[in-house]
Every structure is written in C-alpha cells, then in structure tokens.
C-alpha cells in the first residue's frame, strides 16, 4: 500500500513540475502531457522545439514557395498593367478588387500563379495566341508613338537567311534518298527554312495597312504558328535523330517539291500522315497467335498524324510549306494540287 501511495505521489509531483496541474487546476489533457514529454525528448537529443505563435496570422497556403515569395521584400512590377489584366481574365479572376492598387493586383496575380499554375496551357488555341502576339506588337507600336520609318520593321516577321537559292536547292535535291541520311537531313532543313524565309519576306513586303487588316494579321499569325510547329522537326534534323520512317517520307516529299511534282508530293504526304491502313480496332493479340489486324501495326502502315500532338503539328506545318512552295514556284497546272487555291 505504501508503494502505491508513493507512486501516486511521484506522478502528482511530476505533473506539478510540468505545470499540468496545481493550484485550482485539478485536471489535464493527455495531449498536453504528450506534448511536454515530446519537448523533453527533443531537448535531451539536442533539438529545440519551436513553438508556433498564436498571434501569427494564418497562412493562406502551406506552399513553402509561396511563403518564401511573400516574405521577401517588395519587388518591382515586372509585368505591364495590360498583361496583368490579361492573365487575371484568363484565370477568371477579377482584374481589380475594391481599394486595390496596381502593385497589389500584381502581387495577387503572382500568388494565384504560384497556387494554381496553368495546367491547360497545351489546350489553348495556338492561332489565337499568335494573333494576340501580333496585336500586342501593334499596340506597343501605337503606345510608343512610332511614325512610319525604317524602325517599323522591328515588328516584321523573322526571316531565316539561308543564303541560298531555289536553283541551288534543286541541285541538292537530286542527291536526296541515296543513302546518306545526314546529308538528306541537312537538305531538308535548308529547304524548309528557305520556304519559311520566302513566306516571311512576302508578308513583310506588304503595305502597312494590309498588315494591320484582319486578313493581314491572320496571315502573319499563320506564319508564326507554322514556324513554332516546325521547331521540334528542326531540332530533330539538327541533332540527326529524326525517326527513319518519318525521315524517309519527308525526303520523298522534299524531293518531289524540288522537282515541282506537287501531286506526287501530296501523295507522299498523305502516305505519311494517313497511311495505308487504319488503326485496328478490337482484339489484336490473343494467346500466342497474332490476329489479322496485328500485322498492319508497323511504321509504314500507321498514321503518323495520330502518334502524338508534336508530330501532328509539324506534319501540319509541312503541309503549309508545301502549299507555299507551290504558290511561289509554280509549274504546270496538271502537276499542282488545288491550282490557284491561294
């Protein structure tokens, strides 16, 4: 009995030392005792428990990146007011809250972008984005008050200077498809960039009022979109890692384009983009024996336009350059596709 009383007294003294009971306080929470024991454990191990201040304002997010950004000193506005408004509207947020300054709106936009980054960027309309970029260029020109001088060319389309002519490319085209893949890729790269440059020069040579019209902006946006679509293809050509089946088809297309056989080039394009056979639907592999549709699933029969979005885009860009080539380097109507369509 004495042992039990001594143990109860020891426990009571331990609680009084930890300030859990004593005076008018006769009860305590188990969580308080656990917290005290945890704190003592960390102190014995050489760590210090950091107590959260009750007066601290509740954080709007547990994102450490956001807390770090908000804790920094005030940074200057790196975006214009128009850009801030555009980004807020894209996210369905109000462009200004009551009593909010331009800088506070900018800070709110930064907070929104960190908390909810754009996850549907790839689903945007590329042509609309190119149109918006061209509109912004003309708007910046108007705001700056520029007059019609040589400086207006800064808003023209980018021209790829290949320092070559169509005659030189036609000579290079005679060597296409003879087994030298690296040389073929270099020739394809030159031809595509040459056509982009020809297209850009023609658009830059237009009158200023034509450039600012709806049709003029649409033509410029289409050229910009095509150039952006072809960037992955240019990268593969530069690194010499273009897939063999795609390379073979594009080689045939470029070869026929340089020979001004646009009907044959279009047939080669359809062969690459659509293929001979549709994708098989249903069961293609049961047990150890492949079914009939299985044997058609290889590079020469499938539709590359269905592979992924990147391939679809540069295949579409290639078709536009085929049309541009037919427009500027014409031949007999019988060898053209949709003659005088442009």
UniProtKB/Swiss-Prot annotation:
It is found in: Nucleus speckle. One of its GO terms (biological process) is generation of catalytic spliceosome for second transesterification step. InterPro entries: Prp18, PRP4-like, PRP4-like_sf, PRPF18. GO terms for cellular component: nuclear speck; U2-type post-spliceosomal complex; U4/U6 x U5 tri-snRNP complex; U5 snRNP. Its main location: nucleus. Coiled coil: none annotated. PANTHER family: PRE-MRNA SPLICING FACTOR-RELATED (PTHR13007), PRE-MRNA-SPLICING FACTOR 18 (PTHR13007:SF19). Interacts with the spliceosome. Part of a complex containing U4/U6 snRNPs. Belongs to the PRP18 family. Participates in the second step of pre-mRNA splicing. This is Pre-mRNA-splicing factor 18. The gene is prpf18.
């Amino acid at each position: 009995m004495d042992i039990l009383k001594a143990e109860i007294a020891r426990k009571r003294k331990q609680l009084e030392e930890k300030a859990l009971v004593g005076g008018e306080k006769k009860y305590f929470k188990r969580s308080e005792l656990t917290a005290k024991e945890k704190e003592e454990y960390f102190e014995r191990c050489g760590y210090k428990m950091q107590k959260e201040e009750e007066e601290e304002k509740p954080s709007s997010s547990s994102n450490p990146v956001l807390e770090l950004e908000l804790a920094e000193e005030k940074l200057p506005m790196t975006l214009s007011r128009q850009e801030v408004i555009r980004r807020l509207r894209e996210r369905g947020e109000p462009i200004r809250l009551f009593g909010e300054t331009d800088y506070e709106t900018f800070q709110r936009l930064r907070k929104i972008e960190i908390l909810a980054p754009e996850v549907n960027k790839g689903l945007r309309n590329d042509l609309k984005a190119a149109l918006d970029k061209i509109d912004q260029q003309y708007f910046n020109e108007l705001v700056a008050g520029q007059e019609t001088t040589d400086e207006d060319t800064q808003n023209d389309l980018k021209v790829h200077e290949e320092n070559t002519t169509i005659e030189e490319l036609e000579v290079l085209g005679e060597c296409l498809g003879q087994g030298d893949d690296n040389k073929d890729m270099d020739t394809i790269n030159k031809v595509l960039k040459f056509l982009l440059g020809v297209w850009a020069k023609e658009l830059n040579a237009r009158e200023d009022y034509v450039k600012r019209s709806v049709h003029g902006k649409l033509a410029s946006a289409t050229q910009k979109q095509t150039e952006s679509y072809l960037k992955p293809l240019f990268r593969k050509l530069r690194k010499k890692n273009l897939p063999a089946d795609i390379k073979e088809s594009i080689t045939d297309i470029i070869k026929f384009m340089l020979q001004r056989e646009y009907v044959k080039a279009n047939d080669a394009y359809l062969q690459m983009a659509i293929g001979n056979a549709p994708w098989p639907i249903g069961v293609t592999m049961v047990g150890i024996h492949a079914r009939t549709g299985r044997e058609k699933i290889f590079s020469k029969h499938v539709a590359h336009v269905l592979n992924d979005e990147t391939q679809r885009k540069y295949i579409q860009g290639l078709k536009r350059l085929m049309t541009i080539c037919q427009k500027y380097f014409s031949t007999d109507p019988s060898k053209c596709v949709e003659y005088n369509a442009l």
